[in-house]
Amino acid sequence: MSYAVCRMQKVKSAGLKGMQFHNQRERKSRTNDDIDHERTRENYDLKNDKNIDYNERVKEIIESQKTGTRKTRKDAVLVNELLVTSDRDFFEQLDPGEQKRFFEESYKLFSERYGKQNIAYATVHNDEQTPHMHLGVVPMRDGKLQGKNVFNRQELLWLQDKFPEHMKKQGFELKRGERGSDRKHIETAKFKKQTLEKEIDFLEKNLAVKKDEWTAYSDKVKSDLEVPAKRHMKSVEVPTGEKSMFGLGKEIMKTEKKPTKNVVISERDYKNLVTAARDNDRLKQHVRNLMSTDMAREYKKLSKEHGQVKEKYSGLVERFNENVNDYNELLEENKSLKSKISDLKRDVSLIYESTKEFLKERTDGLKAFKNVFKGFVDKVKDKTAQFQEKHDLEPKKNEFELTHNREVKKERSRDQGMSL
């Protein structure tokens, strides 16, 4: 049986626009190669008929319900995004109509749970390997944005327990996901990252060997090009500035050797030079061949994939650390609440004893006192039930009634002991 998957991600102001680009396919993804753009037209949004501006929609939801005048903090969690999905095998067993019903039932459940007015978007992606829904909840409650209270530890446990249960009731064969799945995803990403690093290291070493071969080959060509050469000199007649003694006005010339733009090398050196030039051409072709090999392409591909996995791994670690921090905060909060509950129970016990003494002093006879006190306890019980019903709370016995029941039980035990 497949697992029901419902993961929550906190989205702050800085990440909202990026979430919009991804969910609505407004920009080509550089990190997700799983997207099949030919199937993007199969995506749809159960909340909106067309693309929206996430910032504007979230602002509308907050402003329409906000009761105070305080501005929203810049680092506040604006959206708690739920990723709703299962594995590929589960969806392959469903026809398109049932796949859509799966997401519609999920949307219906969360709309009722968090309020339809608080759902910013519910985008279903069918253009990736596994269909899934990104459902954005603006965590508004009692006129305030309060993500920590809406999605506290108890609520996250409710999601893990009740979502699979609800979907099973709707006819989908799903079971609850295993605890600690975030850690498992991190370990998987970490393993893939390490595997890629090993492959890249192997390719880098092979490329280093090829580079050494290339350098040695290049040096060889360079040494072959060290050809001894002499300047080519030409004898030319140049004037001396003196005139002939015979007075004919003719200037005296002399012969000098001047360099031309040519050089003279031996026939052997010329042949070596031609060979070196050919070797140089072969070297260039060798480099071109090297750069077009499968190994070079594989190195480039793996380097890119390694960057993507590293980015995903970092994101998972960051999310896991956030969950740990939230968990630690909840632990501290629970300690504080337990302390307060303990104090309140003690106060209720004192009120119970004080009420008991007060009524006892003003009632004649033990039987009459017990009847009056029982009537008082029943009134407290009725008031508690009315309060719970009014505020849609889970029906529970109040602490005053529980204290009374304990006292009655103690009295009965004492009476039984005395009768023995």
Swiss-Prot record:
Residues 388-420 are annotated as: Disordered. GO terms for biological process: DNA recombination. Pfam families: Mob_Pre. DNA binds at Y44, Y114. Keywords: DNA-binding, Plasmid. Gene3D superfamilies: 3.30.930.30. The keyword Iron-sulfur does not apply. GO terms for molecular function: DNA binding. The keyword Coiled coil does not apply. It comes from the Bacteria. InterPro entries: Mob_Pre. Belongs to the plasmid mobilization pre family. Contains conserved positively charged amino acids probably involved in the binding of the pre protein to the RSA site. The interaction of the RSA site and the PRE protein may not only serves a function in plasmid maintenance, but may also contributes to the distribution of small antibiotic resistance plasmids among Gram-positive bacteria. This is Plasmid recombination enzyme type 2. The lineage of its organism: Bacteria, Bacillati, Bacillota, Bacilli, Bacillales.
